[in-house]
């Protein structure tokens, strides 16, 4: 979605009702909708009774304000990995504000830590309140467009960087963590409102304005919709964005599932918005309606209540043509006001504790927020290879380190990033870690053989490579075929800088590769020939510090992969094949991956023992407790991610070869042993019966598996469903 699309959505035309004299403040507070003691729906009834039709139409934008009544709308801000009030896209361009920036969503996913994502959400939500309510800034919004609950079914997808991976349970669990952090823990009010995107199956960029993602209802309910359902029912989100694409031929912004599933079945009764310019695309690209009036009318009838588009004329024409009624508009804009009530925007300021977030130092400059950014980045780092315990480095045994590569002295920001208050590059982090005791040489490229010469003269070479999140090019343009972003899918999985890695490795066998990337690469040669490889995502302001902490052993990496890293493009089905049963993701992939889903190494070792189930069958609550003892058998503290998978043995329908249904990241001191308990829920084992239009829990033999990755099973046991 382009910046201009977002700006257009908030430029609402003046209507006659706004020309009336402003009501005095005392009169405003007398309105029943200002009384927090009244039921929410009664307060909304009062608002609707006071609005003119023109004012109601104005509430179909992203900032449903009614100045005549003193109602100030919510607005929208981006926030996938930190509040975006600046950055490469110049969000909030009239008053850009620095904010704490975390790793991209891909890196947040690799933490496998929903509690940590809750901390990320708290930081982001607090900074949103502060920026809006502090008189010095007085800017921003309280509806935050995050998380991205799309699934990374294909590593070629240009926006893989935004997602938490290919698995619905993992993505949903992490999304719930971020949502709860953004919205806060107050029983009455929200800190901010989390708006998930993009519903649904929106994982190709090329042609997304017109393509249809085709798959059956089972995959809708069992795969693609799972993170969104969890975000609503478990996380409490009451806002999401409909995607550009169609599902089985029906564009998502007018698809009946918006109303019939998310509203009627899940209880999503807040904001449902379009993507930028999507209203025009219904006519121009999808050719689904004869004109924009028809398109706007059907969108409202399906539940859309906020347009990121120039919508007012189409809505007005739809009303004139009787394609839409005032009651239709009343029905949907109730959701806008429900969200405003939860944000406390219609209540006295003293009633809402979040309204007091406006004093004190800028939060993005505090040690607390900096520490969260560093911890998240540390936890996101995945150790892919460590031959002969090459890492961690002992700086007392080193005299010279060569830091090489185009990403070594950069912290690159993506389109949805804000502006961090500072950044620490890999080079800067390494220099700060070793101080004056070790000589650091730096070469960006191998021009004039400089990188090779530096590597030959060093005790160890660290090569830092990866993608450019904006492709260092204009919109919809990526000169490097292996790179992608919004509007551009990747055409290759080959890392162009692997040639540099080869040159350095031949010059110095003691080479470490740091892959800073927004998605997987087919780095087969590197895996076979380089002794140590780590992966981390782009964008974190603490990238260099966290990386240095890992390389020199001050932090033991425990991140895990969230996608299957394939060896070649030939391992993948066609890009637009949305039926994952055709060999997609760890659930159905039939080949030998370069790195499997859930994989990640540590500087220590772990032993699993005493695997047991809570009983021979599920209890009356439909739950089964799965326990295993995990011991750190090494000499340093480390994190293990215990993963619970299931596979159906005799299902009457086609099922995945395995499915993640539980996980827990635990920190264990050297030699410490702990019992890890995971709860398997029968509700998560059902399949969607298309004939009966409901979930079914079938009688079956269920294999319960526990281990550190999808390809490494330590224990398994069959239980009867």
What are these regions (language model features)?
Residues 17, 22-688, 694-711:
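Glycoside hydrolase catalytic-domain context in secreted enzymes
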Residues 5-17:
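Bacterial N-terminal signal peptides
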